[in-house]
């Protein structure tokens, strides 16, 4: 997956860009250049059909610009424009954009029983909801302590080793196992952000903000997919889901954070 390995390049180049314009970040001209820097990889990935990764890139960029001191007026303005655009799309253009599996996956979260008839056929409806439905059953059947490592019905979940690894963990180790797994991941995210906050070099701060944002976004989206509160968009659970390029990218990110921590940190208090 080239887009996974490209995350490193994007985080590093965007961090250097922010570091070069940090005193002029809120000037419209410089902000426009930053948004162009962010938009190019997002559009390329979107054209390839990987909207899940495109969303992660957008969150990475937002976290890094926030860490660099982006004005709240731009943040609130962007949120408002996005909300209005989404509401307008749903209200007036749903008949034009409401085609294809990506759109059906969104509608499957809103109306999983197809009461509004969004699916053109029963076969498409069953194919769309099957993965999340089986994942939810596997996750819920684990109870508090799970069914054991080789017990339960998790084998019936498509891609249980990848996007739905959390359903496998919930089935095998239960609610307690999921809490342990997510607790370790969130501890890593917090440590990454704290390392960035302690960095005496703003470049290190921006790098840690991007890496922390990427981890947090992937965790949140993957958990949402497994709980059927977000559509399936192909976002893996960091360090647990299968995938060579994804795991390689994650370990490189950890190495960058450790480099910032080792060479250029200060005490937060005192």
Give the positions of each predicted feature.
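Glycine/serine-rich anion-binding loops at beta->alpha junctions
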Residues: 2-6, 47-49, 53, 143, ...
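Hydrophobic alpha-helical transmembrane segments of multi-pass inner membrane proteins, especially
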Residues: 2-124, 167-227, 252-256, 270
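Short hydrophobic "helix-edge" motifs at membrane interfaces and signal-peptide entry regions
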Residues: 39-41, 136, 231-232
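Short gly/pro-enriched beta-turn/loop segments at secondary-structure junctions
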Residues: 101, 130-134
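Long extracytoplasmic/lumenal interhelical loops at the membrane interface
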Residues: 133-176
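A juxtamembrane structural motif centered on a specific transmembrane helix
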Residues: 218-270
